[in-house]
Amino acid sequence: MVIHGACAVFWSHDDRYAEATMRFGLKILFLIAWVVFLLGSFRAPALAQTDRADRHRVPAEFMSYLGADWLERAERVEQEEPERVLDMMNLNPGDVVADVGCGSGYYARRMAQRVAPGGRVFCEDIQPEMLEIMRERVREEGLTNVEAILGTPTDPQLPAGEVDWIIIADVYHEMSDPEPMLAGIRRALAPTGRVALLEYRLEDGSGDQIKADHVMSVRQVVLEWQAAGFELEALHEFLPSQHLFFFRVAGGQRQDPILGDYDLFEALDAGLVEVEAWGADDQNVSLRIRRTAPDPILITSPVGMYFEASNEKRDMVARRDGWVILDEDDWQEWSIRAVGRQRERDLPTSNDELTIRSPSTAPVMEAVLYQVQVGTYTVGNSPTLYPPRTHVVEQAAVWIADADETYRDMESEIAGPRVPPSYATAFALVFVERAGIDVTTRRVWDERQTIFRGLRDQGLNIWYQLQTQ
C-alpha cells in the first residue's frame, strides 16, 4: 500500500514486492529505460551522482501540494507529538516565529495560538498552492497573526534579524541546496533566535517506514549545520521516530551552554570517553561508553565502523551511523546496528569483547554499507527507486562484496520474514554495483537466472537487463 505524505511514502512490505512499488510509474520507467538503452545511454550522468554522494546524503524531492491533506492526518498527533515539541520551544506571547516549509500550516497554526497576543507567525513555503491551502485553514480557525511567505529553493525570504524561533519539521532533507537556505535562515534569526529541526531517524530503524532519502542521522545533520555557521544547543529524543534538534547561530548572543559533539574516534583520541564493545546478535553490537569530562556530550559514529572479534568469531560492521548522548557520569549502553562479515564463523556473544576500528579497516564493506544507508538507486534517467533496507539485504551485500559468496551458500541465511532470498540477493547486487564493484565478476552472477527469474519488481528487472547487455 502506498500513502502519499508530507515528506515520504510509507510502505507496507510483504513478499509481494511488485505490489510495493508504484506500478504505473514503473511501467513508464520501463519504457523510458528501454528507449535509453536502445540509444546506448543507460547510465545516469556520473558527475551528478558524484555531487550527490559527496554530500553524504541524497536530497529528496519536495512534496507536492496535492498531498496536503495527509499533513493533517489524525495519526500525526501521536506520531509527532506537536504540542510537546512546541512545549519544549517555550514560546511566549509576542514572539516572532516562522515555519519553514510550512505546508498546510500544521505547526504554524499551533504556534499562532501560543504567541498571541502580539506575536507573529511567518508561514513559508515554495509552492503558492500550498500557501493558499494554509490560508484557507487559517481563515477557518479565525487566526489573524499568520503571514504567508513565498520562498524559493535557495532563500526562505524571511525578514532579517527578526525571528525568535524557526521550526523546520520533516522538510530539511528536501532542500536541494541547503547551504543558501541555511544562510537565509541564519540571517532571519534575531540575536538570540533559535531553530527547532525535526527529522526522522536513520540510525536505529525507528524511521525505516519512511523512504530512505527522507530520514537523516544526527551525524549528517550536525555536520551540515555546523558548516553553515550553527551550533547545537540541544538534542531531544522523546519522539517515537524523530530527532528534535535545537540550533542557534555560532558565536551569537545566547548564553545557554551548547551540546558539544564529537566523532567517536576523535573523542577516544582526545581522552573524552571510554568505550567497550561486545557481541549481541546477528544484527547488533553492544557498546558500553562513558564520558571522562563533567559536561554532557554528543558522540556520533560512522557507517562502516569495524568491530574485530577474537577466538575465530565473526567480525561485525556498523550498517548505519550511530549516536549517543552522554548526559550521565556512569557507563551508558549504546546499541549499534551491525552486520557480520565471515559467514562461516560463529557470531560473537555478549561474552565476546570486540575491538573497535575505523571504517578504513574494511573499505569495501564501508563503501557497500554506505550505499545501503543512502538507500536509493536509479535506472538510467529513472525516478529514484527505493530497495528495502532490511538486515538480510545488507548481509547479502556484504557477503557478495567481501567474500564473493554464492547464492546457494547464502540462501538459507538470508531468508528473512519479509524479503525472499532471491529479492534480498537482487537488491544486494544493486547496492554492490553502486559501491563501484563489477557485479558480473562475482560468483553469484553465475546464478543470476535463478535469482532474477520470476522477480516482479520492474526496477530490478530493468537493472538486470542493463547489466546483462
PLM features: residue spans?
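Class I SAM-dependent transferase core
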Residues: 49-90, 96-98
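Class I SAM-dependent methyltransferase SAM/SAH-binding core
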Residues: 98, 104-155
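A short acidic, Gly/Pro-enriched loop at the edge of an enzyme's catalytic core
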Residues: 156-165
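A short SAM/SAH-binding and catalytic strip from SAM-dependent methyltransferases
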Residues: 164-178
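A short glycine-rich, Lys/Arg-flanked "PGG" loop and its adjoining helix->strand segment in the class I
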Residues: 179-194
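Conserved class I S-adenosyl-L-methionine
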Residues: 194-218
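Asparagine-centered strand-capping/turn motif at beta-strand->loop junctions
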Residues: 289-295, 299
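Intrinsically disordered, low-complexity Pro/Gly/Ser/Thr-rich segments with frequent PxxP/GP/PP motifs
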Residues: 308-353
